[in-house]
Regions:
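Single conserved hydrophobic/aromatic residue that forms the stacking wall/gate
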Residues: 1-13
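Cysteine/selenocysteine-centered motifs that mediate thiol-based redox chemistry or coordinate metal-sulfur cofactors
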Residues: 36-70, 170-197
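A short, polar/charged loop-to-alpha-helix boundary motif
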Residues: 18-33, 157-174
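CN hydrolase (nitrilase-like) catalytic-core segments centered on the catalytic cysteine
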Residues: 50, 56-160
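Short, well-ordered, mixed-charge alpha-helical segments that flank or form enzyme active sites
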Residues: 14-15, 22-27, 53, 61-63
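Short hydrophobic alpha-helix segments
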Residues: 15-18, 153
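Conserved hydrophobic/aromatic beta-strand scaffold that supports enzyme active sites
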Residues: 16, 41-43, 142, 160-164
Length: 197
């Protein structure tokens, strides 16, 4: 079980979210030591707003972002540890990082919400010895509700950054692009199936 807890200004745990999607990829063997979360998709109430915290692998699932948005999240936050496996070519590395940014910026656009993604940097050896380890690509970023980049960190060093986010823009963007309003919820039953026959 992987849990992210948000600590309020009074230094007490405000709420929890448990990672729902667990990977089993080269150098990411989490299915062997984590259990999928059981708390669902519930934003965490803070003095900063309602934060939709989704952990790492959850970032690839538009359903998770949508459920957080529908539950009232005002910002989607993705604490992440993702990088390149040692055998990835430079072209593959570029594709992976671009896909990683694109999918999360897509969550911002589809839900009319800012996205904050925080990723680690550095290298970690694979304790199993199956691979040469992972080089984490950093590149933490903040995107606005239209997917526009408000900030991007470097790929190879730790940084601290303060980024202003205008939460009022989400309402404006949702009026221009009313994706939540125009959903065809009557036609989405098959989304809960593993495969469609």
């Amino acid at each position: 079980e992987m849990q992210r807890s948000l600590v309020g200004s009074e230094m007490c745990i405000r709420d929890s979210y448990r990672k729902m999607h667990i990977p089993d990829d080269p150098a990411y063997y989490e299915k062997f030591y984590f259990t999928p979360g059981d708390l669902g998709f519930k934003p965490i109430e803070t003095s900063l707003g309602r934060l939709g915290v989704l952990v790492c692998w959850d970032q690839w699932y538009p359903e998770a972002a949508r459920l957080m948005a529908l539950a009232g999240a005002e910002i989607l936050i993705y604490p992440t540890a993702i990088g390149w496996e040692s055998s990835d070519t430079p072209d593959e590395q570029a594709r992976q990082r671009e896909a990683w940014m694109t999918v999360q910026r897509g969550h911002a656009v589809a839900n009319g919400l800012p996205v904050v993604t925080v990723n680690r940097v550095g290298h970690e050896e694979d304790p199993s010895g199956q691979t040469g380890g992972i080089s984490f690509w950093g590149s933490s970023f903040v995107a606005g509700p239209q997917g526009e980049l408000l900030y991007q960190a470097p790929c190879d060093s730790e940084v601290e950054a303060i980024v202003d986010i205008d939460l009022g823009r989400s309402e404006q963007v949702r009026r221009w692009w009313p994706f939540l309003r125009d959903r065809r919820i009557d036609a989405y039953d098959d989304l809960t199936k593993r495969f469609i026959d």
